A protein has these predicted regions:
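N-terminal module-boundary/linker segments of secreted carbohydrate-active enzymes
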Residues: 2-79
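Auxiliary, metal-adjacent structural segments of Zn-dependent hydrolase domains
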Residues: 31, 47-49, 58-73, 77-165
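Soluble non-cytosolic domains of exported or imported proteins
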Residues: 108-116, 177-181, 185, 221-225
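Solvent-exposed loop/turn segments at secondary-structure junctions
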Residues: 142-145, 167-169, 200-201, 237-238
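A structural motif
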Residues: 154-156, 195-210
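Short pre-active-site segment immediately N-terminal to the catalytic Zn-binding motif
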Residues: 164-186
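Active-site recognition of the HExxH zinc-binding catalytic motif
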Residues: 184-199, 231
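Metalloprotease/metallohydrolase-associated module, dominated by Zn2+-dependent proteases
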Residues: 209-276
Length: 276
């Protein structure tokens, strides 16, 4: 009796595991990347940039700005002291950067280095993504993080926020191994800005493209909701059309197989892609 019971239990477990593995296989067959362009060096510090110069503006107190960290879903407002910089780009595109000051030390040189890092990276984005955004906030709510930290866009704001991890109090995004990942996330956040504010994107045409791609996605994260799908898809399109030599041929083939209608949608927008 005991042997029969054990056999029955093992059979049920085996069936359940088979079902779970089947679901996992099916799910992984619906997207190209689990983590978008993670192993690809799509951007480097030497990638073309439209950045011209960085100018210190002033010290400024910032109030009622959202505080976010990787391991907490709590959304609190905060006030902090910052160094404000103005970055200038070709085609008369300016951006204001606010670098949060360290609480224990007012280190202007460190803040300037951070501002320069992200200002140059911003210049590597295609012009159509730079046109509408006006501000970048670089936060200092540091906690242990082995990834890229927390990046976000506030609803109906022409700005985005970076709370990336530090290594020995220096920006992790400055490391060669993480630079491209950070630049990819920057493109993703700027895609949120253009989708929610500009009226450039036709919601009906975008929904049609999604429907035609029949529940296939660029990345696993794109499946979260329509906003993340848009941001991930436009980043994949940039990689597929303008950085194809930086990604695997097999992944490029999957782009064309999984999201051809999304790619076509962006192709037909005739965006200003300079300096890519």
């Amino acid at each position: 009796k005991d042997a029969a019971f054990v056999t029955e239990v093992e059979s049920k477990i085996e069936k359940k595991l088979t079902k779970i593995n089947s679901k996992k296989k099916k799910a992984s067959g619906s997207f190209v990347y689990e983590f978008l362009l993670w192993d690809d060096k799509v951007f480097t510090k030497k990638s073309p940039t439209t950045f011209k110069k960085l100018t210190f503006n002033k010290e400024e107190n910032i109030s009622k700005v959202m505080k976010r960290v990787q391991r907490s879903s709590t959304k609190k407002k905060k006030t902090f002291k910052s160094f404000s910089f103005i970055a200038e780009y070709e085609n008369n595109i300016p951006i204001e950067l606010f670098i949060e000051q360290d609480k224990d030390k007012k280190d202007f040189e460190k803040a300037e280095q951070e501002a320069l890092l992200f200002a140059i990276m911003y210049g590597q984005m295609p012009n159509f993504l730079k046109t509408y955004n006006k501000k970048i906030y670089v936060h200092n709510d540091v906690e242990f993080d082995d990834g890229l930290g927390t990046w976000w866009v506030m609803y109906q704001k022409k700005e985005f926020h970076i709370n990336s991890p530090k290594i020995n109090k220096k920006q992790a995004c400055a490391k060669i191994g993480r630079y491209s990942n950070c630049a990819v996330v920057m493109a993703h956040e700027l895609a949120h800005v253009i989708q929610q504010l500009t009226g450039v994107i036709s919601p009906s045409k975008w929904k049609k493209a999604i429907k035609l791609d029949k529940k296939k996605y660029c990345s696993k994260y794109a499946k979260k909701n329509s906003r993340e799908d848009f941001a991930e898809s436009i980043t994949c399109w940039i990689a597929a059309r303008y950085k194809s030599d930086k990604i695997k041929k097999s992944d490029l083939a999957k782009f064309n197989e999984f999201i051809p209608n999304r790619l076509k949608f962006f192709d037909e927008m005739n965006f200003n892609m300079y300096p890519l």
